């Protein structure tokens, strides 16, 4: 069993039950899924760029991403409806815990001038969104093979009802929030 999943069952669940006075263990919020999305704007003129982004996301998450397509045509960006412009991966279960563990313990500390992630990135429904400026913070990415530095959005979807519950859950998991 994954280290974080075990920690959730043995330590985090009892701690949250006592803090928020839940009547049942099933009321305890948990991480439902993690969605990693990367936009590849230069895929409009360069189709190789999208292939590279898909390959990098596959290495980072261990799962093949879905290519996202443009919903509308935007003339200013030379974009037609249905053109591939990004990639996203939805992680659940074991892979989700492994990715989250890697993100918190390895990748985030590798960010330059890292002082913690913002406490304000909750959406009011208990979900947390995190922007990463470069894919190089992940250990799977080989620095020499990167053609272009790309960022990504990481959305952590929890079953928490409020932001306070979600913040406490992620703090217990070891998410480094700003002081």
Curated annotation (Swiss-Prot):
InterPro entries noted in UniProt: Ribosomal_uL5 (IPR002132), Ribosomal_uL5_bac-type (IPR020930), Ribosomal_uL5_C (IPR031309), Ribosomal_uL5_CS (IPR020929), Ribosomal_uL5_dom_sf (IPR022803), Ribosomal_uL5_N (IPR031310)
Q: Does the keyword Lipoprotein apply?
A: no
Gene Ontology cellular component list: cytosolic large ribosomal subunit
Which keywords label this protein?
Ribonucleoprotein, Ribosomal protein, RNA-binding, rRNA-binding, tRNA-binding
Q: Which family does it belong to?
A: Belongs to the universal ribosomal protein uL5 family.
How is this protein organized at the quaternary level? Part of the 50S ribosomal subunit; part of the 5S rRNA/L5/L18/L25 subcomplex. Contacts the 5S rRNA and the P site tRNA. Forms a bridge to the 30S subunit in the 70S ribosome.
What name is this protein filed under? Large ribosomal subunit protein uL5
> To which species is this protein native?
Bacillus cereus (strain ATCC 14579 / DSM 31 / CCUG 7414 / JCM 2152 / NBRC 15305 / NCIMB 9373 / NCTC 2599 / NRRL B-3711)
What does the organism's lineage look like at the top?
Bacteria, Bacillati, Bacillota, Bacilli, Bacillales
Question: Which gene carries the instructions for this protein?
Answer: rplE
């Amino acid at each position: 069993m994954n280290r974080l999943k075990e920690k959730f069952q043995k330590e985090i669940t009892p701690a949250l039950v006592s803090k928020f006075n839940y009547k049942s263990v099933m009321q305890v919020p948990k991480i439902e899924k993690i969605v990693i999305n990367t936009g590849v704007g230069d895929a409009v003129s360069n189709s190789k760029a999208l292939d590279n982004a898909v390959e990098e996301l596959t290495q980072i998450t261990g799962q093949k991403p879905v290519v996202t397509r443009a919903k509308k045509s935007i003339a200013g960006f030379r974009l037609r409806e249905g053109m591939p412009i990004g990639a996203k991966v939805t992680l659940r279960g074991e892979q989700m815990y492994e990715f989250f563990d890697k993100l918190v313990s390895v990748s985030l500390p590798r960010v330059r001038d890292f002082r913690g992630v913002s406490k304000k990135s909750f959406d009011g429904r208990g979900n947390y969104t995190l922007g990463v400026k470069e894919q190089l913070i992940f250990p799977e990415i080989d620095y020499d093979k990167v053609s272009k530095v790309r960022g990504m959005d990481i959305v952590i979807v929890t079953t928490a009802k409020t932001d306070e519950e979600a913040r406490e859950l992620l703090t217990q998991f070891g998410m480094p929030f700003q002081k």
